[in-house]
Amino acid sequence: MLGVPFIDRWLSETFKPKTFDDAVDRLSYVTTATLLAFFSIMVSCKQYVGSAIQCWMPMEFKGGWEQYAEDYCFIQNTFFIPERSEIPGDVEDRQKAEIGYYQWVPIVLAIQAFMFYLPSWIWSSLYKQCGLDFPSVISEAEALRSQDSETRTKGVNKLVDFIGDILDTRSKNEYGRFYCYRFGKGLGSMTSMLYICIKLMYLANVFVQFIILNKFLGNETFLWGFHTFADLYAGREWQDSGVFPRVTLCDFSVRKLANVHRYTVQCVLMINMFNEKIYLFIWFWFVFVLITTFINTLCTIYRLSFDSSRHNYIRSLLSGPVNNFKDEKAMIASFANNGLKQDGVLLMRFIDDHAGAMVTKEICEELFKKHGENLQHNRDFHHGHSTKSTSPGLEEGHHEHLYTPEKMKLMAPDYPIKHA
């Protein structure tokens, strides 16, 4: 990417995309984190390998004195006074005009890059506790895209069996509820709630990034980037605005025998020419990431939290005999709420994003068939033994109307039914 083998390899391995996320997640932890890391490395090379500061010294300064003064001014900050203004004689007034951020730009950029990567790292560390191996399932689904029809069918059946095993153990692992969410390992709602929290972390991180920019650069408004761009467009340069000044002043003292001599020198900060362009780009990029992340977070919450959204999505994946009749709507609701649940719908969306709609439809249709077969088996068991049904969710009063005898047509789809 950068043309430098070591840096290219390090960035690629560090900010490698994952399979269990969406494009907006990757916008933060891959694209933005890589950009910030690249800017950090670029500024570091200019600052510590090249010449970060050059000062105009008095005539009596020779060799080592000049190097000492430049190193001192770079470390101890410089201050900016507009050319048309008089240099204040009071030390406190000079300290108020100090610019102390340019030395820390590489470090702050590196910290910001890590902050964009942090939610992804937390997500990767915690999702395994929810009982579902997302990477394996999604990777297997991705591999099916390039297979022929017969091989893909066998692969789909294996995947469906694997997911079905998790579906069969969901009731044993659930141990709590919160509104429409169920807690526990397996396919309940634990993973979905965790993913929503991660989405909120991505969103909160962008807000924090704007606060960091303001505090670090000493701005009083969150519209700094817009104002700076407006100044540049209007021809108002740094000499007047004081934003990333190239020419600054520096005070330092030199002890000669028993006397201390105070000097004020004028310095050139070429690094600020890069910093201005970098931070102006970063500000507008953060605005784009903020808007995109905000919209995506709202959409994710809606898609995972509202029954209507989950039902509509599942209906779009089923190309079989699913019409808008009441019974068939109830069947889809049973499959989405008691079969897949929120975590299963989230898995279907990840597979859809990475493996494509065709593979996702085949997997979802097979899972739907298995769900219908399980309902038929439970219905037969219920009528044959006159006992309470063990169908998922029935003991909680959900979808009891699905299991009445007058709705036999719902339990008799056009695919073969397996009886226990």
Curated annotation (Swiss-Prot):
Molecular function GO terms recorded: actin filament binding; gap junction channel activity; gap junction hemi-channel activity
Keywords: Cell junction, Cell membrane, Gap junction, Ion channel, Ion transport, Membrane, Transmembrane, Transmembrane helix, Transport
Compositionally biased residues, Basic and acidic residues: 395-405
Single biological process term from Gene Ontology: monoatomic ion transmembrane transport
Membrane topology of the entry: Multi-pass membrane protein
Subcellular location: Cell membrane; Cell junction, Gap junction
Region (Disordered): 378-405
TM region positions: 33-53, 104-124, 193-213, 278-298
Tissue expression per record: Evenly distributed along the adjoining membranes of the two pm5 pharyngeal muscle cells.
Gene Ontology CC: cytoplasm; gap junction; plasma membrane
Disruption outcome: RNAi-mediated knockdown impairs gap junction function in pharyngeal muscles which disrupts the synchronized muscle contraction between the pharyngeal metacorpus and terminal bulbs and thereby decreases the pharyngeal pumping rate.
Subunit structure: Interacts with F-actin.
Protein function: Structural component of gap junctions. Plays a role in maintaining gap junction activity to promote phayngeal muscle contraction.
Family according to the record: Belongs to the pannexin family.
Entry protein name: Innexin-3
The species this protein was found in: Caenorhabditis elegans
Gene designation per UniProt: inx-3
